[in-house]
A protein has these predicted regions:
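Membrane-associated alpha-helical segments
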Residues: 225-227, 231-320
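Generic hydrophobic segment detector
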Residues: 55-81, 86, 210-212, 234-242, ...
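Short Lys/Arg-enriched alpha/beta "domain-start" segment
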Residues: 1-197
Length: 320
């Protein structure tokens, strides 16, 4: 299948990304990352060291035959497979994502499974797909008996987190986030656009309009990167929320050092994003000020550590 909006390609791609701190006390090494993400025996874990350590599991397919989410209640039906994978960044942050793409129409009757398995990660409608209704419905969340891609991502996350190699001793109190996304081809003459929305319950939604020919897998990679950096912002902001101005909190320096040791070096926007989609990240960063906020928080952490080091040197010793 081709890219978004091409004659042989899909008219819609949707997915969900879950992000959390790997439940272990220290960042794991490359060999351990490979063990964690070895979800299939017939395909190797992909490892990268540049621009940072990055491990990607083999893809897993989940067969579905159900109604897609719909804001209009349209009783459409899709059949095929959702593709999912797990990603580990610098041995420290774990992500699981699941996504699919869909063409505008399919056969009027359901075909045998062999027809669908030849197009992994594609859900083919029975008849026509109400694209706008499904796009809006996916972002709003699934109803009863509707496709729930988030549950596929969550199941994969739980599978990795149950691995016996993890010690479940977290160095930081962190939040878990979910990012739900849709992508459709931009109409002729329309510029690329991204609409990013945050909710208080850890859910983020991203609605994308992208150039014709954009590969759904590239969109999924972009949204994993957006989810990672949103999680970093959220987690560090949560740790700094209500930070006392004084030096009476003896446990505070340890919290600050943990942020430096485990998270501050992970900020690397677009590090694993397809080059054709770099401008989407840049547009979001320009409007939302993600990098500016990150730099301010990082400087605040370093200033607090320096201030506490200076104060500790000037405190009188017990014998004075």
């Amino acid at each position: 299948m081709g890219g978004l909006g091409t004659p042989s390609g899909p008219v819609l791609a949707c997915g969900e990304v879950r992000t959390r701190l790997l439940p272990t006390s220290h960042a794991v090494d490359e060999r351990t990352a490979e063990r964690l993400l070895r979800l299939r025996t017939d395909e190797r874990v992909r490892l990268s060291r540049h621009p940072n350590r990055y491990a990607v599991s083999p893809g897993l397919l989940t067969g579905v035959d159900c109604r897609p989410p719909s804001v209009t209640g349209a009783r459409s039906r899709v059949v095929g497979t959702v593709t999912a994978r797990a990603v580990l960044v610098e041995g420290r942050v774990l992500q699981s994502s699941a996504h699919f793409s869909a063409p505008a129409s399919g056969p009027d009757r359901r075909r045998p499974w062999g027809h669908y398995l030849g197009r992994p990660g594609c859900l083919i409608p029975v008849g026509r797909l109400p694209v706008r209704s499904v796009t809006e419905g996916f972002l709003a969340g699934p109803g009863p008996h509707e496709l729930d891609v988030g549950s596929i991502a969550e199941s994969l996350m739980a599978r990795v987190c149950r691995h016996r190699i993890l010690d479940f001793d977290l160095p930081l109190t962190t939040v878990n986030t979910s990012l739900r996304w849709t992508a459709v081809p931009a109409v002729e003459g329309e510029v690329t656009s991204v609409l990013f929305t945050k909710a208080d319950d850890g859910l983020r939604t991203v609605a994308l309009r992208l150039p014709h020919g954009t590969a759904p897998a590239a969109v999924a990679g972009l949204c994993e990167d957006l989810a990672l950096h949103d999680w970093l912002l959220t987690t560090v902001a949560y740790a700094l929320d209500g930070l006392p101005a004084g030096h009476e909190d003896s446990g505070l320096p340890e919290v600050l050092r943990s942020l430096v040791d485990h998270l501050l070096h992970l900020w690397m926007p677009r590090g694993h994003v397809d080059r054709t989609l770099h401008t989407v990240w840049e547009e979001l960063d320009e409007h939302a000020g993600c990098s500016r906020q990150w730099n301010v928080m990082g400087q605040r952490i370093r200033d607090q550590l320096v201030l506490r080091a200076v104060r500790s040197r000037h405190q009188p010793s017990a014998g004075d």
